[in-house]
Amino acid sequence: MGGRRILDRVVDVLERAAGSPPLLVANAADAAQWRPDLAVVPDVLPGHGSLGGILTAVETAGAALCVAWDMPFVSADLLAALAAGLAAADAVVPESDSRRGLEPLCAAYGPACGPAIRAAIARGDARAIGFHGEVRVARLPRAAVLQYGDPAVLFFNVNTPDDLARAEVICRNHASFR
């Protein structure tokens, strides 16, 4: 997208927000080749989708900023705000215009989330928010998210060729994404 891989964009933003290289949670056999400079860790409980990835991140790193690698327009400043919120909560999740009103795949999670995620998986709940009732969750209000950009752009996911074409248009029309 715009001459750069989406993964590279996300890694760069995470590194700016956290001040250190991120951990790449991936199960693909060739994942270590995607970014040889990053530590790659497979899911600790394979087969549980995004929730398994969040679990892996918190059990490996303790506190973790988790961002889906197909979210090319997320902001480093937004991620830093989410991470700062962990001082008063176990998870910090931004509000959005999505169906569920939250973006759990662009959030900060603390170590207390690990046992709660394991409990959710054990009861068959693999939703990315399935453990939220068991931990202290702070919501970053949509009004606060707007300080970092349009939520529809910040949390845009590239899942299809049509999404990629839309992302290319966004990239061309916003100088900050080039």
Q: Where are the language model's segments positioned?
A:
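Nucleotide and nucleotide-moiety/phosphate-recognizing core
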Residues: 1-125, 133-154, 169-172
